[in-house]
Amino acid sequence: MTAIQHFFKTFFLTELLKGLALTGRYTFRRKFTVQFPEEKTPISPRFRGLHALRRYENGEERCIACKLCEAVCPALAITIESETRADNTRRTTRYDIDLTKCIFCGFCEESCPVDSIVETQILEYHGEKRGDLYFTKEMLLAVGDRYEKDIAAAKAADAPYR
């Protein structure tokens, strides 16, 4: 670039005007910003959100303490303790998920042989302290009880792909 060309580019501010023209072109286009939480975007049917533990229709919890979900979790976010009952079946005494470690990969849900642990469509949850994101067995069962109809519908819709 010659000195004269450089002088004209800097004197007439052509680079600045090109930038302003580009900005002007995008000023009046449709905006893609979503004003969350007032506006919501559609959620995929396979979205993986908050975990829940399910129960059978008779009220008994589904988890058989096989510990497959604990073994397959890449983030080591699941902790399970179990005991043998009088009828020689295992049941969990402790089932904890640390959501600060969880990467929501869905391996726990895929590995469960009795569909006990599921990931729901719930994405609006928070914790003000680190301990608020540590879900115990009772908390997970409460989520499962509250949203059982939604969970069952999502499982039925996803059945052809399993």
Curated annotation (Swiss-Prot):
GO molecular function annotation: 4 iron, 4 sulfur cluster binding; iron ion binding; NADH:ubiquinone reductase (non-electrogenic) activity; quinone binding
Catalytic activity field: a quinone + NADH + 5 H(+)(in) = a quinol + NAD(+) + 4 H(+)(out)
Pfam family of the protein (one): Fer4_7
Co-factor requirement: [4Fe-4S] cluster
Residues at which [4Fe-4S] cluster 2 binds: 73, 102, 105, 108
Enzyme class per UniProt: translocase
Cofactor note: Binds 2 [4Fe-4S] clusters per subunit.
Keywords: 4Fe-4S, Cell inner membrane, Cell membrane, Iron, Iron-sulfur, Membrane, Metal-binding, NAD, Quinone, Repeat, Translocase, Ubiquinone
Membrane spanning stretches: none
EC number, UniProt record: 7.1.1.-
Membrane topology, record value: Peripheral membrane protein
Subunit structure: NDH-1 is composed of 14 different subunits. Subunits NuoA, H, J, K, L, M, N constitute the membrane sector of the complex.
Protein name: NADH-quinone oxidoreductase subunit I
Gene: nuoI
